[in-house]
């Protein structure tokens, strides 16, 4: 991996027990997994010519062209080929999209902001302004916080759990694309029926921008460019899913995903690491302008979305109280119960981060020993704060030290609950599209071929 030829910031390297993507694509030369779309960027994989000159006349193959859609349909590796991720979704695509669109919007995750803040020694306020200034100088109209989209997800998760029969539990979070790919390709029949149907914040943000904002501004979705800055390379893969295209079109709701490290490299390259003067946009709505003013929204429950904590909160509110107890099983596993005064367990949720812990969970589920109601799952040890696209450091000690700082910065983010703005957008969206709620959910399906035999643990 270290000799891949890619910039150091775009490698998924040495993230503890995280399973890195396979560099050797196994899609056969003769077959196509997914029909290619003309507009998709492509990566050429050339094959060596046979030694036998005579046979080469009949056996020589054309270049194989692999897209992210191919990766999603193939079970050759857990996530995807790094080459494809980098070549298809890069800053070149961002510049092109901004130039060719009538409206450009960038969604930025608070995890990315805190990672950059730790790296350059600035506050999250300052970093938010730097990022907004950088993109607006490129021609982006709106730079928004993904926390606004996460609010839609939070409003739905307890309702989803409440309607999930106890026999179908645990309900598994779906915000981590690495885990979703693992579930689809390795344990489809067991895990897919239990995965939450609620979209991730990135996917919801794409729906808001292409499904709501575009309509409100009188634009076609194809005239709007939406990029996202995320802590995870697999978010690039998520954006390429067929489910996350504007209904009835080939237009992606999120056109391009850039990792935290890729963004910082580009900001430094353009010598734009200071917050510049951004024109006064006080007339803009709060959710469209807050990030540009340095406002970043955090959440109770840590940097991985706070889904488990939100369920506990809503359960306690609905049931008039309860005794909440949290146990740390290891540094990447947490269990929380809500008990009655008599000691009866009324609700049990868990946080499970890192593939080793995920595998232990799967083993328990196979033997029906897992009694948890809801599990917040992240593929990376440490969760989203330690995503594969975050700023990486040379030694493991330095990585752990910086991760603690990133988590602390996230914990210190204000819990601004702009309920009024959120309700206003939701109501306005419903007026434009009475079926808007459908855009907050998705479906997953197993990938038929099993890859257990090719995994190297």
Swiss-Prot record:
Changing residue 373 to N: In allele qa5001; increased sensitivity to oxygen. Residues 38-59 are annotated as: Disordered. Signal peptide: none annotated. [4Fe-4S] cluster 2 binds at residues 176, 232, 380, 384. Disruption phenotype: Arrest at the L2-L3 stage in 90% oxygen. Pfam families: Fe_hyd_lg_C. [4Fe-4S] cluster 1 binds at residues 25, 71, 74, 77. One of its GO terms (cellular component) is cytosolic [4Fe-4S] assembly targeting complex. GO terms for biological process: iron-sulfur cluster assembly. SUPFAM superfamilies: Fe-only hydrogenase. It comes from the Eukaryota. Gene3D superfamilies: 3.40.50.1780, Fe-only Hydrogenase (Larger Subunit), Chain L, domain 3. Keywords: 4Fe-4S, Iron, Iron-sulfur, Metal-binding. InterPro entries: Cytosolic_Fe-S_CAF, Fe_hydrogenase, Fe_hydrogenase_lsu_C. One of its GO terms (molecular function) is 4 iron, 4 sulfur cluster binding. Component of the cytosolic iron-sulfur (Fe/S) protein assembly machinery. Required for maturation of extramitochondrial Fe/S proteins. Belongs to the NARF family. This is Probable cytosolic Fe-S cluster assembly factor oxy-4.
């Amino acid at each position: 991996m270290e000799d891949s030829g890619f910039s150091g910031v775009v490698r998924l390297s040495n993230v503890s027990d995280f399973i890195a993507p396979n560099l050797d694509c196994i899609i056969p030369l003769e077959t196509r997994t997914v029909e290619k779309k003309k507009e998709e960027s492509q990566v050429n994989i050339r094959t060596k010519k046979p030694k036998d000159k005579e046979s080469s006349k009949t056996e020589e193959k054309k270049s194989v062209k692999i897209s992210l859609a191919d990766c999603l349909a193939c079970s050759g590796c857990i996530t995807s080929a790094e080459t494809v991720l980098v070549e298809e979704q890069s800053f070149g695509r961002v510049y092109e999209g901004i130039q060719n669109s009538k409206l450009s919007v960038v969604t930025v995750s608070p995890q990315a902001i805190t990672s950059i803040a730790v790296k350059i020694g600035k506050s999250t306020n300052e970093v938010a302004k730097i990022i907004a200034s950088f993109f607006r100088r490129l021609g982006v109209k709106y730079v928004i916080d993904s926390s606004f989209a996460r609010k839609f997800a939070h409003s739905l998760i307890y309702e989803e759990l409440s309607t999930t029969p106890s026999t179908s539990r645990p309900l598994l979070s779906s915000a981590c694309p690495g885990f979703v790919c693992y579930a689809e390709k390795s344990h489809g029949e067991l895990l897919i029926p239990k995965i939450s149907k609620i979209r991730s914040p990135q996917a919801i943000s794409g729906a808001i921008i292409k499904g709501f904002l575009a309509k409100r501004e009188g634009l076609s979705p194809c005239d709007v460019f939406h990029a996202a800055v995320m802590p995870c390379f697999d978010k690039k893969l998520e954006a390429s899913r067929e489910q996350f295209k504007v209904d009835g079109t080939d237009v992606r709701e999120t056109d391009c995903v850039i990792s935290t490290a890729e963004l910082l490299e580009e900001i430094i390259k353009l010598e734009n690491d200071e917050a510049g003067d951004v024109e006064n946009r006080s007339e803009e709505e709060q959710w469209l302008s807050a990030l540009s003013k340095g406002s970043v929204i955090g959440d109770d429950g840590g940097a991985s979305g706070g889904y488990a904590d939100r369920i506990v909160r809503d359960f306690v509110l609905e049931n008039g109280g309860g005794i909440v107890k949290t146990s740390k099983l290891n540094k990447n596993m947490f269990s929380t119960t809500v008990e009655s005064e008599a000691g009866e367990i009324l609700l049990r949720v868990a946080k499970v981060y890192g593939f080793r812990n995920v595998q232990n969970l799967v083993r328990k589920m196979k033997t029906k020993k897992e009694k948890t109601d809801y599990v917040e799952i992240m593929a990376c040890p440490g969760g989203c704060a330690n995503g594969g696209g975050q700023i990486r450091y040379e030694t493991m000690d330095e990585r752990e030290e910086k991760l603690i700082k990133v988590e602390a910065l996230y914990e210190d983010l204000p819990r601004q609950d702009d309920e009024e703005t959120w309700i206003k957008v939701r109501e306005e969206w419903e007026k434009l599209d009475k079926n808007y709620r459908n855009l907050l959910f998705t479906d997953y399906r197993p990938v038929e071929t099993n890859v257990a035999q090719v995994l190297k643990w």
